[in-house]
């Protein structure tokens, strides 16, 4: 996601409203708020946000939880409820099960009664995914993803694959789908996926590339997604997995660790 430079970075955060513009309604100084869809610039002590991109933060959800969950949690909310509406009893394949989005997805799927086959790069990450609700873990460095999915599902394969890895897993993701299945490519941490011929969809498969910003463009959908997330957090069904807290001055190191896949869960930057 290239951005024009110079400019701020960071997409999600939580805090207290200090001032509001003359035409703003619905918010006032002192309000607790959070955001994950709007202009970048969260890596700052003060962030000027358009009111349409901010949501009220319930007292039951703390600032750290909101900062750790907003973007990732609302991503899972739309993936599981809007991109494809999952149903209890289904089995899905979810890549990067021990990542920031993955650990939230594991908890959410468990609460929905959905069986998850997750992928992870190490036994340590596999165990982390299992602790948070992943039913089966494939170690993608040493195991064949497609064959393991076939074994776990007894040949049925899966109706939905959620793939945020991109180039390295795309072919296996398509091959793991059952007829009329849906491939949800919502990220590309390993690099962009090359152009895909329509024949790769085998006549019955569906391919979509959703994004949070596109879903959150409409205010009512943004509020619905945030409300769904806050309900899951307030009920205890989903909780933030905060791996570490770092000062804002160490943001570059946090990014280096993220790019090198040395992280699990969320890293909080504190001004």
Q: Would you name each region that the model predicts?
A:
Residues 59-82, 94-98:
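A glycine-rich, Thr/Ser-enriched phosphate-binding loop motif common to dinucleotide/cofactor-binding enzymes
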Residues 1-41:
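Glycine-rich beta-strand-centered segment in the early N-terminal region that forms part
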Residues 28, 59-62, 85-91, 155-156:
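Short helix-loop-beta connector
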Residues 101:
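Hydrophobic/small residue at the entry helix of a nucleotide-binding pocket
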Residues 235-244, 252-271:
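C-terminal capping/lid region of NAD(P)-dependent oxidoreductase domains
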Residues 37-51:
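A structural motif shared across PLP-dependent enzymes of the aminotransferase-like
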Residues 94, 110-169:
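Adenosine-nucleotide cofactor-binding segment
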Residues 112, 168-238, 271:
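Glycine-rich phosphate-binding loop and adjacent beta-alpha segment
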């Amino acid at each position: 996601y290239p951005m024009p430079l110079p400019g701020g970075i960071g997409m999600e955060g939580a805090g207290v409203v200090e001032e509001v513009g003359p035409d703003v309604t619905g918010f006032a100084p002192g309000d607790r708020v959070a955001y994950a869809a709007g202009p970048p610039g969260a890596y700052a002590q003060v962030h000027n946000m358009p009111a349409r991109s901010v949501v009220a933060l319930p007292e039951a959800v703390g600032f750290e939880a909101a900062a750790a969950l907003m973007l990732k949690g609302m991503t899972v909310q739309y993936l599981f409820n809007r991109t494809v509406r999952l149903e209890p009893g289904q089995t899905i394949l979810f890549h990067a099960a021990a990542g920031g989005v993955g650990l939230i997805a594991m908890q959410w799927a468990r609460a929905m009664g959905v069986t998850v086959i997750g992928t992870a790069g190490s036994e340590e990450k596999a165990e982390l995914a299992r602790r948070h609700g992943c039913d089966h873990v494939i170690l993608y460095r040493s195991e064949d993803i497609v064959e393991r999915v076939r074994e776990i599902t007894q040949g049925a394969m899966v109706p939905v694959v959620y793939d945020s890895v991109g180039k390295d897993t795309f072919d296996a993701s398509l091959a793991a789908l059952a007829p009329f299945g849906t491939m949800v490519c919502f990220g590309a941490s390993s690099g962009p996926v090359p152009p895909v011929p329509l024949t790769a969809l085998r006549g019955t498969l569906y391919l979509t590339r959703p994004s949070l910003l596109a879903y959150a463009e409409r205010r009512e959908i943004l509020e619905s997604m945030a409300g769904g997330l806050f309900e899951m957090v307030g009920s205890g069904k989903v909780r933030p997995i905060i791996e570490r807290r770092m000062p804002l001055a160490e943001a570059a190191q946090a990014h280096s660790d993220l790019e090198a896949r040395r992280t699990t869960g969320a890293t909080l930057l504190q001004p």
